[in-house]
UniProtKB/Swiss-Prot annotation:
Job of this protein: One of the essential components for the initiation of protein synthesis. Stabilizes the binding of IF-2 and IF-3 on the 30S subunit to which N-formylmethionyl-tRNA(fMet) subsequently binds. Helps modulate mRNA selection, yielding the 30S pre-initiation complex (PIC). Upon addition of the 50S ribosomal subunit IF-1, IF-2 and IF-3 are released leaving the mature 70S translation initiation complex.
Name of the protein: Translation initiation factor IF-1
Highest taxon listed in the record's lineage: Bacteria
One annotated Gene Ontology cellular component of this protein: cytosol
Span list, region Disordered: 70-91
Gene Ontology terms, MF aspect: ribosome binding; rRNA binding; translation initiation factor activity
Gene that this sequence comes from: infA
Chief subcellular location: cytoplasm
Organism phylogeny: Bacteria, Pseudomonadati, Pseudomonadota, Alphaproteobacteria, Hyphomicrobiales
Keywords: Cytoplasm, Initiation factor, Protein biosynthesis, RNA-binding, rRNA-binding
A Pfam family hit: eIF-1a
Record organism: Azorhizobium caulinodans (strain ATCC 43989 / DSM 5975 / JCM 20966 / LMG 6465 / NBRC 14845 / NCIMB 13405 / ORS 571)
Subcellular location: Cytoplasm
Length: 91
């Protein structure tokens, strides 16, 4: 299946489910089951309840989708000049 055939919708994450799945309510009031795209997992982009997301769906299965973009919330950004916390231990 080529990427041109995918449908894109915007929605809101309503529930975080086990195994990296999410319940998303689309702007047209349909509720679907979605999973995070591989690049989101690779870059450790966390998705929580209430986040605005863009979902790709196949025209053959309109009940499942892939989250490929999470919109940045305005209140979650760190202040300018703030240092990022390191995830490793210096020796």
């Amino acid at each position: 299946m080529a990427k041109e055939e995918l449908l894109e919708f915007e929605g809101t994450v309503t529930e975080v489910l086990p195994d990296g799945n999410f319940r998303v309510r689309l702007d047209n009031d349909h509720q679907i089951l979605a999973y995070a795209a591989g690049k989101m997992k690779k870059n450790r982009i966390r998705t929580i309840e209430g986040d605005r997301v863009v979902v790709e769906m196949s025209p053959y299965d309109l009940d499942r989708g892939r989250i490929n973009f999470r919109h940045k919330a305005e209140g979650n950004a760190p202040p300018p000049g703030a240092r990022r916390q390191q995830n490793f231990r210096r020796r």
